[in-house]
C-alpha cells in the first residue's frame, strides 16, 4: 500500500522520447487526476492510460458525510491530505484556504 501511494506523489514525467500520448497523473496538490503529454518511453509510474485508472489507483477512499459550509477565508493550515488522515467521524475538508479535519454532517444534510 505504501509503495502505491508513493507512486501517486511523483511528478508527471514526459520521458525522453518524442511521442505525444495523452495520459493522466495524480496531482496530490489538487487531489485530482490531471492530463499530461507522455513521450512514449521511460518516465515514472504516475502515468495512467485513463482517468478512471488513475482515480482507482491514487484517489484515497472518501468517508460518508458532508463537509460544513465555509464562512470566510478560513485558516491557512494544511492539516490533512485525505479523509484517512482524520479521526472517525471527520473528513478532510477545504475551509476556504487550507485542508483541515472537520466533523461532518450526515450525508444529504450540508
Curated annotation (Swiss-Prot):
Domain spans labelled BPTI/Kunitz inhibitor: 8-58
Q: From which domain of life does this come?
A: Eukaryota
Tell me the protein's name: Chelonianin
The cross-references to InterPro entries, in alphabetical order and at most eight, read: Elafin-like_sf, Kunitz_BPTI, Kunitz_BPTI_sf, Prtase_inh_Kunz-CS, Serpin_venom_toxin, WAP_dom
Q: Which controlled-vocabulary keywords does the entry list?
A: Disulfide bond, Protease inhibitor, Pyrrolidone carboxylic acid, Serine protease inhibitor
What this chain does, per the entry, is described as: The first domain inhibits trypsin; the second one inhibitis subtilisin.
SMART domains in UniProt: KU, WAP
- The chain positions of domain WAP read 60-105
Where does this protein come from, organism-wise?
Answer: Caretta caretta
- List-wise, which residues carry Pyrrolidone carboxylic acid? 1
Site positions per UniProt: Reactive bond for trypsin:
18-19
Say yes or no: keyword Disulfide bond present.
yes
Please report any disulfide bonds recorded for this protein chain, giving both cysteine positions: 8-58, 17-41, 33-54, 67-92, 76-97, 80-93, 86-101
Q: What CDD domains does the annotation carry?
A: Kunitz-type, WAP
**Cellular component GO terms, alphabetically?**
extracellular region
Q: Which GO terms describe its molecular function?
A: serine-type endopeptidase inhibitor activity
Amino acid at each position: 500500500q505504501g509503495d502505491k501511494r508513493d507512486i501517486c506523489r511523483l511528478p508527471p514525467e514526459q520521458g525522453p522520447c518524442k511521442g505525444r500520448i495523452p495520459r493522466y497523473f495524480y496531482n496530490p496538490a489538487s487531489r485530482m487526476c490531471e492530463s499530461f503529454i507522455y513521450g512514449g518511453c521511460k518516465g515514472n509510474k504516475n502515468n495512467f492510460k485513463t482517468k478512471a485508472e488513475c482515480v482507482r489507483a491514487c484517489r484515497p477512499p472518501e468517508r460518508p458525510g458532508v463537509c460544513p459550509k465555509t464562512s470566510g477565508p478560513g485558516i491557512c493550515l494544511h492539516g490533512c491530505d485525505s479523509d484517512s488522515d482524520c479521526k472517525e467521524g471527520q473528513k478532510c475538508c477545504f475551509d476556504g484556504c487550507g485542508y483541515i479535519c472537520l466533523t461532518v454532517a450526515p450525508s444529504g444534510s450540508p
